[in-house]
Amino acid sequence: MLKRTKGLLLLTLLVITGLAGTLKDSIISQKERKSAISLMKDTKADVIKSVKGLSDAQINFKQAPDRWSVKECVYHIAIAEKNLWDLLEGSMKASANPEKRSEIKLTDEQLIKIMEDRSNKVKTVSSFEPQNTPYKSLHEALNDFKERRTDHIKYLKSTTEDLRNHVVQMPFGSIDCYQLSLMIASHSNRHTQQLNEVKASPDFPKQ
């Protein structure tokens, strides 16, 4: 009887240890967490810095009728922050699909590089177009972006969710939800670059 009890206890300990290992393995590493948070913080600061002190004439200036103004770039950054994070949250509420990890072709570094490469032109979907956003001013859009990004950083600091085993299908291929958080941050970098290109135009108002 004692042998049997010891055997059951050992089996229980093995199961618990095994489960603990599984849970630990499914949580993003400290290195991954730090990388995502740093990217989120840095790109947030860049957006804020890029529009600081600009006049109405400057934020509304367009290099051409079919090009975005500084204000429109911020509208796009803000709505993308919301919509892409909504996608992440929806994916995390669904069942994990680790079997789809084999469909992921991009490393974290490759994804960031592609997103931040402005030579790779991509037409945005209609719901992300500045004129289709709910914002009425740059101030409103910027505040919405800042509040959401702050919440997203808090989430990444504390989450124990299995981001790597929730895979989502994007127009360019499959990525996991950790990569989606990197995509959100690098997307804002991409359009901060665009915004700075507008500011660098020879015709950009002096004030």
Predicted regions and their residues:
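Bacterial N-terminal signal peptides that target proteins for export
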Residues: 1-9
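Cleavable N-terminal signal peptides
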Residues: 8-11, 18-19
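Short, helix-capping/interhelical loops that line the mouth of catalytic, cofactor-
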Residues: 16-35, 86-143, 175, 202-207
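Short, contiguous alpha-helical
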Residues: 61-110, 158-207
